[in-house]
């Protein structure tokens, strides 16, 4: 990812950055409209997820997370921007005439060939079962359930590592630091997801944040007591509690939100560190 700067005309161009390399195109039968449902409200119009709403209209790009075109070579035709995720996507033309979008692997360029199957080389962008990969392989787009498609390590810059294989399971270290077991027959894609420097991008102004569907975040200490436990007081007052809390009164710092008796607990060897 190449971060470009604007010439300074206004405060927003002074502070904002842009990536001018990647554009968006419209592939036939791969892009379609979707119902706008990301406003953070339930059926009664009550806010259930704060700080969401608005944003620019989006067309959904159908991404191939399953990589089920087995043993058919494909060629990367374009590298495109996708408004629905922070990673870039690639348009692949397969030898049988099929066209698919996949997540852009870091280091892959236009013209590269990729393939998925059981007996393919360990090359960036290739997809194959974990049982066929050597230990230490960097992977992304990892399946949890066989045939369901990749569900882990799909964000921009995400990369996991295959650290062990024993019996019917493989041990994976995820980007969060979690170490868990996955069936060896599940597939994954070799390499790291592209657009690694997405966290270095500066939006430059509040309006750019609103285009993304993000609404302002207000501190609880400046609210009224009816709206937040930190609110109230005369002038600039402290929160009035020993520790910060959420708007619903739960501890805000360090509280674990994962259910203790979740079904997947038996597959986790070490919990996340991030």
UniProtKB/Swiss-Prot annotation:
GO molecular function: rRNA binding; structural constituent of ribosome; transferase activity
Chief subcellular location: plastid
Keyword entries, A-Z: Chloroplast, Plastid, Ribonucleoprotein, Ribosomal protein
PROSITE patterns reported in the protein's UniProt record: RIBOSOMAL_L2
Annotated spans, Disordered: 224-274
InterPro entries: NA-bd_OB-fold (IPR012340), Rib_uL2_dom2 (IPR014722), Ribosomal_uL2 (IPR002171), Ribosomal_uL2_bac/org-type (IPR005880), Ribosomal_uL2_C (IPR022669), Ribosomal_uL2_CS (IPR022671), Ribosomal_uL2_dom3 (IPR014726), Ribosomal_uL2_RNA-bd_dom (IPR022666)
Subcellular location: Plastid, Chloroplast
Gene Ontology CC: one annotated term: chloroplast
One record GO biological process: mitochondrial translation
Record note on quaternary structure: Part of the 50S ribosomal subunit.
Entry similarity comment: Belongs to the universal ribosomal protein uL2 family.
NCBIfam families: rplB_bact
Database matches in HAMAP family: Ribosomal_uL2_B
Protein name stated in the entry: Large ribosomal subunit protein uL2c
